[in-house]
């Protein structure tokens, strides 16, 4: 990423996610943020860029393009509440929610089932 701030201590596999601070992901999660991928918490690797962020997936042998990655919400038995992202970003929950950009699809769940979705900008919902 920008400035080569993050360097892997060992040979590492890194996943590139197609969202960044233009989508409302706080730049402050650099070095503090985590995502859920394949049932495991994985750290954000390096800086959050305008349109992408990178995640260390070294311990996930079968990580593949198209895998679901969760930044806010639940995956399997794991959960990343918005409050946690806000705390790691040194801000409040409402700032996180109000900054989510139009390119981020909204998916609505009730009792574990998708009840609707809304896409305000580019990308598929």
What does each of the following model-derived ranges do?
Residues 1-125:
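Active-site anion/phosphate-binding pocket segments in diverse small-molecule metabolic enzymes
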